[in-house]
């Protein structure tokens, strides 16, 4: 931080940069080591202020971890210096987060005047939009939800949760068979049989049609299952309201278990300290008090999520 704030074009960043101090005042008095010490104390002071304020801690950590190629310490420091107080600085950080989240919607190349925030809102609320296949943006949104809920509940998000590492994108419910089972006819027949329970409002005649096609197919069922997946996506299977981040080992331990089994394992693991769980993930699984995760649950989850994200952005 010291080097970034007081760079020396004639000296690389290494230990000797600190050896002779800095003539910050430019007075040539010979107290450069003392001046550097005072400056280090000053930097430590405001960085500690940042760390001890929950909002600043969360927003800065989110920016540095998720947009590190675009955010630098000096620019953040100048924003701090030019702010009228902590509340003003917090607002500026929210503006920075909003700018980078909405950037893809501001530069999408389409010739329309629809505001970027409105475009994001539409994608978040659209049940047929496949966020599962838009993983980079999805992860940033899900982590931002952790930040939002942590700030609201006075919970300090662990520093390793500002990035997704060793985690899978998990469907909360209604997931199709695992990748290794995509050609397993028995798994698909079992899945179609359960679709009525998910209350997806799929016409029974359509389900019967899928069932018959699978029964007739002797070996390769890729075409049939891919068509089923495409149609299910339009009902919200891959919408953002049906997706969370979950520890890879935990996710793979129950494979395609029912929602009720999955929910029980996740919450039990959390209370037994077997796995730490992200705030939004825990909220998603604990908010449903029934044994099923239906289309109605996906709709409610999607609406709540879209509202919380759009309400946060400036």
Residue ranges and their predicted role:
Residues 1-314:
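Flexible coil/loop and intrinsically disordered segments
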């Amino acid at each position: 931080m010291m080097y970034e704030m007081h760079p020396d074009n004639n000296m690389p960043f290494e230990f000797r940069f600190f050896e002779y101090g800095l003539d910050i005042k430019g007075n040539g008095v010979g107290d450069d080591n003392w001046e550097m010490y005072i400056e280090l104390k000053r930097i430590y002071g405001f960085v500690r202020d940042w760390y001890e304020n929950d909002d600043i801690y969360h927003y800065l950590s989110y920016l540095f971890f998720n947009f590190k190629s675009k955010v630098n310490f000096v620019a953040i420091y100048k924003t701090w210096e030019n702010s009228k107080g902590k509340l003003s600085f917090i607002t500026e950080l929210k503006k920075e987060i909003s700018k980078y989240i909405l950037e893809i919607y501001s530069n999408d190349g389409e010739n329309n005047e629809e505001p970027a925030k409105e475009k994001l809102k539409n994608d978040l609320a659209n049940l047929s939009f496949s966020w599962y296949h838009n993983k980079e943006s999805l992860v940033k949104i899900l982590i931002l939800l952790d930040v939002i809920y942590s700030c609201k509940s006075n919970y300090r998000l662990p520093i390793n949760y500002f990035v997704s590492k060793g985690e899978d994108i998990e469907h909360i419910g209604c997931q199709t068979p695992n990748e290794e089972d995509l050609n397993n006819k028995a798994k698909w027949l079992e899945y179609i049989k359960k679709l009525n329970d998910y209350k997806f409002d799929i016409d029974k005649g359509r389900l019967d049609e899928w069932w018959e096609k699978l029964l007739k197919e002797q070996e390769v069922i890729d075409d049939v299952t891919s068509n089923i997946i495409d149609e299910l996506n339009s009902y919200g299977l891959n919408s953002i309201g049906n997706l969370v981040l979950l520890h890879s080992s935990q996710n793979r331990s129950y494979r395609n278990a029912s929602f009720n089994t999955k929910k029980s394992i996740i919450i039990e693991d959390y209370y037994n300290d077997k796995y730490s769980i992200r705030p939004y993930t825990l909220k998603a699984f604990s908010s449903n008090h029934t044994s099923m995760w239906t289309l109605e649950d996906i709709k409610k989850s999607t609406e709540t999520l879209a509202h919380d994200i759009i309400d946060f952005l400036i």
